[in-house]
Amino acid sequence: MAATQELSKGGVEEAVEEDDPAALKPGAAPFGNFPHYSRFHPPEQRLRLLPPELLRQLFPPEGPERRPILGLDVGCNSGDLSMALYKHFLSPHDGETSSGTSRELRLLCCDIDPVLVERAENGCRFPDALTFITLDIMDQESRKVPLSSFLSQFGRSVFDIVFCMSVTMWIHLNHGDRGLCEFLAHVSSLCSYLLVEPQPWKCYRAAARRLRKLGLHNFDHFRSLAIRGDMASQIVRILTQDHGMELACCFGNTSWDRSLLLFRAKHTEETQAIPESSTKETGTD
């Protein structure tokens, strides 16, 4: 969802734009929909932790038809990370599909902000492979049709993989503990694999402080949240204990101290060992 210099360990809770009220119109990003997110959290920081061959090993070619790998990117912002993930996973070397050894990748990318979605559509370098839509993933009624319509194009009922990159905090702050649990229940039901980048608790405090600086009301749920503390561990607990998933791999932490956690639905057949990143750093503590 939104420099290239490593952030200090004092853990700048969010990047400069996210913590500087002057960088945004007041209240302009209550859902993390920052207009220039990737300038401060560049895609490369995530990509260096994710093995390029990951999707090929999780979803090897099967049969002559080689149906495409289907992915859902929740909270895609203006699409920079979506496009970077697509190119990163397409080929381990030069961004070109190796014919005969890999499957096509099709991504449905959604965000709650129509302005960011329009920017993503206009700037998309892979329009045949990436579809951008405006969608509130927490709206149980409005999400049904676009998700099922995309899947039905390929004769599928679930995605192969769902990406939730730095979105859990915004769901949590805007919808409370119940909303976070409902979100995790829903996305885990949609896929075989789930890649989550949870924001740590210090980011919650920074988001609340930013609203106070802007003279706005605090997030309605912030002070009443019972799920708090080590958010990576909390999300692991919810997904593994309540929603039939298992933690398959932690690929390490970004320079802004967010872990990349890959979960696998327990009913999913494990095809090959998950490759580790050559730059793997730390786990969830």
Curated annotation (Swiss-Prot):
Q: Where does this protein hold S-adenosyl-L-methionine? A: R46, N77, D111, D136, I137, M165
Q: Identify the keywords attached in UniProt to this record, alphabetized.
A: Cytoplasm, Methyltransferase, S-adenosyl-L-methionine, Transferase
Cellular localization per UniProt: Cytoplasm
The species is: Rattus norvegicus
Task: State the reactions this protein catalyses.
Answer: a 5'-end 5'-phospho-ribonucleoside-RNA + S-adenosyl-L-methionine = a 5'-end (5'-methylphospho)-ribonucleoside-RNA + S-adenosyl-L-homocysteine; a 5'-end 5'-phospho-ribonucleoside-RNA + 2 S-adenosyl-L-methionine = a 5'-end (5'-bismethylphospho)-ribonucleoside-RNA + 2 S-adenosyl-L-homocysteine
| PROSITE patterns listed in its UniProt record | BIN3_SAM (PS51515)
Q: What is its main location?
A: cytoplasm
Q: Does the keyword Iron apply?
A: no
Q: What does this protein do?
A: O-methyltransferase that specifically monomethylates 5'-monophosphate of cytoplasmic histidyl tRNA (tRNA(His)), acting as a capping enzyme by protecting tRNA(His) from cleavage by DICER1. Also able, with less efficiently, to methylate the 5' monophosphate of a subset of pre-miRNAs, acting as a negative regulator of miRNA processing. The 5' monophosphate of pre-miRNAs is recognized by DICER1 and is required for pre-miRNAs processing: methylation at this position reduces the processing of pre-miRNAs by DICER1.
Domain of life according to the entry? Eukaryota
GO terms for biological process?
Answer: negative regulation of pre-miRNA processing; pre-miRNA processing; RNA methylation; tRNA methylation
Residue stretches making up the Bin3-type SAM domain: 53-275
Cellular component aspect of the GO annotation: cytoplasm; cytosol; nucleoplasm; plasma membrane
* EC class (word): transferase
Q: What EC designation does it have?
A: 2.1.1.-
Against PANTHER family, the record matches this protein to:
BICOID-INTERACTING PROTEIN RELATED (PTHR12315), RNA 5'-MONOPHOSPHATE METHYLTRANSFERASE (PTHR12315:SF1)
Q: What is this protein called?
A: RNA 5'-monophosphate methyltransferase
Q: Which family does the UniProt entry place this protein in?
A: Belongs to the methyltransferase superfamily.
Question: What gene, per UniProt, encodes this protein?
Answer: Bcdin3d
Q: Which Gene3D superfamilies match?
A: Vaccinia Virus protein VP39 (3.40.50.150)
The record's note on quaternary structure and interaction partners says: Interacts with DICER1; the interaction may be mediated by RNA.
Q: What SUPFAM superfamilies does the entry give?
A: S-adenosyl-L-methionine-dependent methyltransferases
